Amino acid sequence: MLKKQKIIIIVFVALFVVLTILYFAVIAPLTKDDGEETTEPVETDVGESRTPQNYWLIFPQVEREDIKSIEVHNKYGTYKFYRNKEDKFVIEGFENLAYDQEQFSQLVVSTGFTISQVKVTENPTEEQLKEYGFYDDPAYYILTTKSGTVHKVIIGYKIIAGGGYYAMYEGRKTIYVLEKSLEKVVLAPVVDMVAPLVTAGIKSNEYFNIDNFKIYHHDKLFFAAQNLTSEELKERETTALVASKVTHPGDYTPSNIYDEVRLGLVNYVGDAVVALGLTEENLKEYGLSDPPYTITYNYKDDSYKLIASEPVDGYYYVGTYLFNTIVKVPEEDFKFLSWSLLKWIDNSAFQRSITFVASIKVETPQFTETFRLTHLDKSSNPNLIVKGDLCGVIDGSDEVYNFRQFYKSLLTVQIEGEAPLTDEEKAELIANDKRCILKFTVTTLGGNVTEYGFYRYSTRRCLLTVNGVGQFYVVIDVPRKIAGSAQKVIKGETIDPQEKY
């Protein structure tokens, strides 16, 4: 019996020791009051919230699909993106302007997800507001939701460490710190988000439909060209290099460079947009108040207009009326603006297929003759009869062949360069009949009439005029050869293509 009692006592002692250890090791620390305050949940201002990482959200996150508009004001100006009737975001006042979608997505994130790791202060003093940059027209943005909720956040100075910006929510006296990433969108000029398009809306395989192309130097027309009509195209089908004609400074054929320029203008993109709006202020800043260069053209039913500055540090500044912007363009891409007229004109001054010629009038100081052409057969081997006031009827194969040699001499008129004459000197020269070596006038079956004149101004050169307008010169041998060949036709003499005059 005694032994059994000892065992029970030992068990109770062991249990007491275990319970004592458990009390001091576990329970006592949990109930101990050491005088320290317990941690309470952090209070938030109305409209604020906390993220799972315990960061501040200045206002609840707004997703892209819930945004109605975002207005931004910074040192570069004010702009606004809004959702249009097609449910697409556009820039107010520049609705047809393309913009960088990635940049806009960053704007949505920066303005709709306002996360702040810290609150700098609450109820700031006037001195603190100045210190943190909330005076003197600070930057801000206004985000409006589809439901009509408006959030306005004001941006202050960059924090000393450079990792963010001080910010305040309008109507709330609390200063936060927002992430540095907002400087790339909210604090940047809107032009950084705009695609630097100069032209658009034309398919590259339809560049040849660009028509009524003109270049002005200041307000003076420098070069103009237009597409040939179907009738004109037939007249030049065997000789024309391009399906266009120059209309200024005269009726010439454009060089192949004209097509290259038209192709280059299709959907052209520059380096950067430097200004939105062709305002007087912007035009003055980029040398466009009195634009040195103006380009106009049509494409189907649309009209296009570009203005360009003089090149500055390797760039042109190009104002585009399509997008109402000024774009920085590499000088190399628009070098055609500085080209001389000669580069735009094909050297072959006369390009007509004889098949579509009705008559040729030749005038020299020695004679005047009109050759009237009758085309009996328009197959691949057409027959030709020529009647002249002096030469009579030309219908034999040898005589017709000889006449064709004369016609070939017209096709040899080659422009050599621009005549070094002033407008006054040209006018005086053209008015002097004694200086005219030759004129020939071609009338087509379609009724088009073109007169070519050759006026000697030096021992080796003649001013070439087309319908009375002169710009280029040819060597004097050219009109002499044409006149000599015409005279041989009149006299019935054989033309030697190699003969010099």
Map each language-model feature to its residues.
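Soluble, acidic/polar mature domains that operate outside membranes
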Residues: 2-501
